[in-house]
Amino acid sequence: MKVLVTAKRVIDPYVKVRVKPDGTGVETANVKMTINPFCEIAVEQAVRMKEAGAVTEIVVVSIGVTQCQETLRTAMAMGADRGILVESADEVQPLAVAKLLKAIVEKEKPNLVIMGKQAIDDDSNQCGQMLSALLGWPQATHISNVTVNGDSAEITREIDGGLEKLTEMFRVKAQSGLRFALQGVIAKSRSAIACSTIAAVRSIHPLTLTKTFLHRIFQGGRL
């Protein structure tokens, strides 16, 4: 079984975020960046499934600047087999991300897509649901465990008041609510990453991408 996992590059959660003086965004220059923690959980889940013999290949995808290759290498050091980067110098909004991921899914043809439930920078929690709708796939959100049983997945979801257990036939899109080995980090740091651009993806899969314009961000306590 082939699994596709997404990984977003975000500001390290332990870094104090500073708003730019003109209010057009937050400072990212010379700021420590890392893989989104929820995406890290998703990669970990995929790796556990591979170790259990249920998964044969893990493909990790990131959309963003060239430096996102570092994020992909982190995921590959954890156990992912291949990395795909769709480069974009601009911030890509959730619906556009979902459309780009749909094109990649149609090309890679995974049996399962695992995504972090949300990114810690914008907390949108939108891409997974949008991707599921665009693909017409069943989905399970806020999951804590996935167990593969033949051609189906037994999923445990965290809900108000307890846990919900579902059985989904593939194909499925799941949102997951660490592992590092030095040898893996060294080996994967030399691995090739397939890089593309939004324009290249759109030339194969015609997409209409919308853009959200940010006017101003205010520091906490300032209105």
Question: Model regions: which residues?
Answer:
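N-terminal glycine-rich FAD/FM-binding segment characteristic of electron-transfer flavoproteins
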Residues: 1-223
